[in-house]
Design a protein with these regions (language model features):
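Positively charged, aromatic-accented nucleic-acid-binding surfaces
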Residues: 2, 27, 82-84, 90, ...
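Short coil/turn segments at secondary-structure boundaries
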Residues: 20-21, 112-114, 167
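Fold-independent oxyanion-binding glycine-rich loops
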Residues: 21, 118, 136
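Amphipathic alpha-helical interface surfaces
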Residues: 33, 95-96, 147
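Hydrophobic alpha-helical interaction segments
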Residues: 136-205
């Protein structure tokens, strides 16, 4: 019953979803969830062509997307990092360079995906992906888990002397009205030089 319920929830999330045992503790105990996921992953390994549940690493699974040309695809570093943080009960924020790339302020793709976290500094290898987690101060993690956090990190990448109207415009367009309200509220916890920039973003029509 537990295995069936877990499988239904996974399939309901759709292909590309990544998950950990902690995502299913409302269904059963940790031991029973571990057993169910292991059983589903073993079934998927035996029936690779069906694209069932796949074990990515210890305590980390996915329901892989499929491409007509390339077959089952590997999950993105961003999705993996979020799942790892969720599994370990940590908060997560992209590094300044990653945030700038995500918001279109930089075309440079970091060679190694790096995330700031309230957990220990470590490197996590999942399949071909090598992801760096760096312990950061609470001020660096303001807005973590929201678009606002990505904006603050992107501003760190740009720097106070390089912010112009084009950057303000791009950042403003990345946020909806609720995001802008949250940005204004959270800005009290970021460096003072960001305050006037945040005001411009919030006021942007």
């Amino acid at each position: 019953m537990i295995t069936s319920n877990i499988k239904q929830r996974i399939i309901g999330k759709g292909r590309g979803a990544i998950f950990a045992p902690t995502d299913f503790l409302d269904i059963g105990s940790r031991a029973s969830v571990d057993q169910a996921l292991s059983r589903l992953a073993d079934q998927g390994q035996a029936l690779r062509h069906t694209g069932q549940i796949r074990r990515l690493a210890r305590g980390l699974y996915d329901y892989p997307k499929k491409s007509p040309r390339f077959g089952f695809l590997s999950p993105s570093a961003d999705d993996i990092a979020k799942a790892v943080a969720r599994k370990d009960g940590q908060i997560l924020q992209p590094s300044p360079s990653m945030a700038a790339n995500q918001l279109g302020l930089s075309t440079q793709v970091p060679s190694k995906p790096t995330y700031m976290t309230d957990g220990p500094t470590r490197t996590k290898k999942v399949g071909r992906q090598v992801i760096q987690f760096r312990k950061a101060s609470p001020k660096t993690l303001v807005g973590a888990g929201h678009k606002t956090g990505v904006v603050f990190q992107a501003l760190r990448y740009v720097g106070k002397d390089r912010v112009d109207s084009q950057i303000v415009d791009r950042l403003a367009r990345a946020l909806d009205d609720n995001d802008r309200k949250l940005l204004a509220k959270q800005s009290r916890h970021v460096p003072a030089w960001m305050h006037p920039v945040v005001q411009q973003i919030v006021a942007h029509a």
